[in-house]
Amino acid sequence: MIHSRLIIIGSGPSGYTAAIYASRALLHPLLFEGFFSGISGGQLMTTTEVENFPGFPEGILGPKLMNNMKEQAVRFGTKTLAQDIISVDFSVRPFILKSKEETYSCDACIIATGASAKRLEIPGAGNDEFWQKGVTACAVCDGASPIFKNKDLYVIGGGDSALEEALYLTRYGSHVYVVHRRDKLRASKAMEARAQNNEKITFLWNSEIVKISGDSIVRSVDIKNVQTQEITTREAAGVFFAIGHKPNTDFLGGQLTLDESGYIVTEKGTSKTSVPGVFAAGDVQDKYYRQAVTSAGSGCIAALDAERFLG
């Protein structure tokens, strides 16, 4: 069994920032990059241009930003492993963590496994198709991209998050279409009224996108009316999934307190979870903001909390 004083599960802005702070505090953390969001390094590894992370006035590629963070953490003494932690035991001290390759133990643990955007299996939406080439799951992250400016954009969903995305996208697109397979929304009445009163938003009821097409970027969508089965093709520059996120917490086996949506519950103003010595950072405990910079900040908090815990 391999022991480390501090193990960080997950990478991305929260995991790497936690590692930078922890390694500078001479905690010699072991970081499992993992593939919880589908790729080692988190969701930013599938993002092209990141324009809202401080310090990069011209923007920076998502993979470049993550590689920079990783290099910084490693330079200060973090050891990284490209493995997934598949199970944990927080009932014993030191904590026991298992990957497919090895068993590890630690005195403190930071969970930074993120949350994965729920996606529909639509032709054209895959990672090797138009994902991050016009198809995305974060309007705030990607909406200002030049490929969306003054173009027709489509949001899939019917809840508050879908309408928030649609309202945000009206700043950039020429028109925003909300595609919903039912004839009424799940969103709050106040949010629905705001969207209904926005002349740049149109609702496509009883409809679903069945195909996304383009060349190097998205150019069109096929939309099916679920009642008549009629399919129409429309010009489109962007398709935004707004059907929720799933926090990557299944591997915890119910050992930490989660909220009703599966996010890790932390003590207000800290990264402390329901188990002393276990801390959470990033999107795995943040259902509201989900930004690279807020994730990085929470990673810093988790490292400082872990340092104080370890003494």
Curated annotation (Swiss-Prot):
Disulfide bond entries: 138-141
Reactions listed under catalytic activity: [thioredoxin]-dithiol + NADP(+) = [thioredoxin]-disulfide + NADPH + H(+)
CC per GO annotation: cytoplasm
Keywords of this entry: Cytoplasm, Disulfide bond, FAD, Flavoprotein, NADP, Oxidoreductase, Redox-active center
SUPFAM superfamilies: FAD/NAD(P)-binding domain
EC number: 1.8.1.9
Keyword GTP-binding among UniProt keywords: no
Any Gene Ontology biological process: removal of superoxide radicals
Cofactor: how bound: Binds 1 FAD per subunit.
Main localization, broad class: cytoplasm
Keyword Coiled coil annotated: no
MF terms (GO), sorted A to Z: thioredoxin-disulfide reductase (NADPH) activity
Cofactor(s) the protein requires to work: FAD
Localisation per UniProt entry: Cytoplasm
Binding site for FAD: 33-43, 283-292
InterPro entries, per the entry: FAD/NAD-bd_sf, FAD/NAD-binding_dom, Ferredoxin-NADP_redctase_2, Pyr_nucl-diS_OxRdtase_2_AS, Thioredox_Rdtase
Subunit record text: Homodimer.
Family of this protein: Belongs to the class-II pyridine nucleotide-disulfide oxidoreductase family.
Note in the entry: The active site is a redox-active disulfide bond.
Name of protein: Thioredoxin reductase
Organism: Chlamydia pneumoniae
